[in-house]
Amino acid sequence: DASTSYYNPAGLSELRYSQLVLGAAYFKPKIKLFNAVATDRAGNPLTGNNPTEPKGRMFIPNGHVAWRVSRDFSLGFSVVEPFGVNTVYGNQDMARLMATRTRIRTLDFSPTFGYKVSKSFSIGAGLDFLRISTNIASVVGTTGGGGSEGGSYVINKGTGRAIGYHVG
């Protein structure tokens, strides 16, 4: 099907018709931390909810289209999210010192082509235009002494772009 444009663009030349393929996955992590221990700078245990279980869900879309230009030549285009994570811990959760929120999303936009050189040999290639965004938050700056907890809520955000290629 048309998703070959992302995984193996040479396979585009094997498609008999133009195609559109849409899909999605719903991801709800089920993670439990038991006996989580965190200490302040003086080594005193900090309090918090234990066991911890993060919340956070992700909808992961993908779409692929293939155009049969001729019997031996096809073009494709894919939009996929090859990597992502989304977890949320409460501000009073034991895991708050690691992260209260972690969200990383990547999108890959990929134009491709496939060409059938002979009956038993095809080539294909594609470009990958990637975009990544991240949002990571945590509680930091706990005080020392007697397990007292101060701290600030810190949010780190970032975005990036990259260009790559794949052949098959």
List where the protein language model places each region.
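A gly/proline- and charged-residue-enriched helix-loop-helix capping module
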Residues: L97-P111
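Membrane-embedded beta-strand positions of outer-membrane beta-barrel proteins
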Residues: L20-A24, F77, F113, A125, ...
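Extracellular loop and loop/strand-boundary signature of outer-membrane beta-barrel proteins
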Residues: L46-P51, M94-T100, S148-K157
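Repeated loop/turn-to-beta-strand initiation elements of outer-membrane beta-barrel proteins
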Residues: F73-L75, S120-I123
